[in-house]
């Protein structure tokens, strides 16, 4: 591998699966995928839970780091652990494992990992996923006045144009598949994508998000050119969404007859 080329590693870490992306940053918008995969480090049953983390770290080193350490990897992005669990022991275990994998990357590759939250990774990788929240958690449309106000205020949220129950990881995997149609995804016997595909695609999202934030700077969204057409009980609200040097035209269709408690 040419030492002058910028080879970047990215990891999405959980104690059961490590999503891995190895990419050649060739200056293009998305780079070239060298490897997009996952590692499921298996240890014997009844292994002490603390020792298991050390064993899994060794498996990751043997199955991936040692295999690719000669590629001249120059950077490593790691998705920062999402500390939303109510189980403090689960959070502590994830933090420990994340730190152990980070240390393995540093020791084996001589690269200091860079961390990015899942929220920032998704927002910077695919800003077009930011949208006006149209539906509540009960999947019912918000009232017209609330939606119109959020458009006027430019209040965009991640996955805002999707229903609350949307499988976010599936949306991200589909976007990665669109960018790299040559990737061979893994399916089960029912023809369904296995969940480890999502760990792999999350690793790419972390990498792309980190690169985009560095390339284009902090991202700020604004809305302009708001116009509205009514067709009976339906309102068609059109507007432009601005971020970086890009403009995306959006249209939101709203049923004006909906009445509900907007706090839900």
Describe the residue ranges of each PLM region:
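Phosphate- and other anionic-substrate recognition elements at nucleic-acid/protein interfaces
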Residues: 1-264
């Amino acid at each position: 591998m040419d030492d002058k080329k910028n080879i970047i590693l990215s990891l999405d870490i959980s104690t059961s699966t490590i999503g891995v992306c190895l990419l050649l940053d060739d200056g293009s918008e998305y780079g070239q995928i060298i490897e997009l995969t996952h590692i499921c480090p298996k240890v014997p049953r009844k292994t002490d839970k603390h020792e298991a983390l050390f064993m899994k770290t060794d498996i990751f080193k043997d199955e991936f780091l040692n295999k690719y350490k000669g590629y001249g990897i120059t950077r490593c992005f790691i998705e920062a652990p999402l500390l939303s669990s109510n189980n403090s022991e689960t959070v502590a275990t994830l933090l420990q494992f994340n730190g152990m994998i980070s240390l393995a990357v540093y020791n084996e590759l001589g690269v200091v990992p860079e961390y990015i939250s899942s929220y920032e990774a998704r927002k910077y990788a695919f800003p077009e996923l930011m949208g006006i929240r149209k539906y509540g958690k009960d999947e019912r449309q918000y009232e017209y006045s609330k939606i119109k106000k959020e458009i006027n205020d430019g209040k965009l949220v991640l996955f805002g144009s999707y229903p609350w129950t949307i499988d976010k990881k599936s949306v991200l995997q589909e976007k990665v598949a669109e960018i790299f149609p040559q990737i061979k995804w893994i399916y089960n016997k029912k023809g369904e994508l296995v969940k480890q595909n999502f760990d792999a695609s999350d690793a790419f999202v972390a990498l792309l998000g980190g690169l985009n934030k560095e390339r284009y700077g902090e991202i700020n969204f604004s809305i302009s050119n708001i116009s509205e057409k009514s067709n009976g009980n339906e309102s068609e609200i059109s507007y432009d969404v601005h971020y970086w040097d890009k403009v995306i035209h959006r249209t939101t269709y709203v049923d004006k007859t909906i009445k509900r408690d907007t706090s839900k």
